[in-house]
A protein has these predicted regions:
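Charge-dense, helix-prone N-terminal extensions
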Residues: 6-12, 23-27, 54, 97-111
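Arg/Lys-rich, positively charged N-terminal/basic patches that mediate binding to nucleic acids
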Residues: 1-37
Length: 111
């Protein structure tokens, strides 16, 4: 998949493994690197959703439209589809199989 970042600061924080580990610690840093590699290698968001360890799911409430992917409890990688027109199913839900571009919003504790 094609990845972009919500800010230049975030892009710098997630630029390489050494920087990620320095910013987020060894355990979280390695897990973040793994998730970024999985996102890059996946053809679409549905592929990532099939990996049970990611616990990828859509959020609701004030974070509606965002997608959460587990990093290491309690942290989550927050994403949004980066398409000009967000792929939707006929029922209005997100069509995970057609999402091929994602914007990373950040790594946060959503709880």
């Amino acid at each position: 998949m094609e990845l972009s970042f919500a800010s230049r600061k975030l892009a710098k924080e997630l630029a390489d493994e050494k920087t990620i580990v320095r910013n987020y610690g060894t355990d979280n840093g390695r897990r973040i690197c793994l998730r970024l590699a999985q996102l890059t290698a996946a053809d679409d968001l549905e592929t990532l959703r099939l990996l049970p360890q990611t616990r990828a799911h859509e959020l609701t409430g004030d974070r509606a439209g965002q997608i959460s992917v587990d990093v290491k409890h309690p942290y989550r990688l927050l994403l949004v589809p980066a398409h000009d027109e967000i792929p939707r199913k006929p029922d209005g839900g997100l069509d995970w199989a057609r999402v091929t571009k994602l914007k990373i919003l950040g790594i946060v504790d959503t709880h």
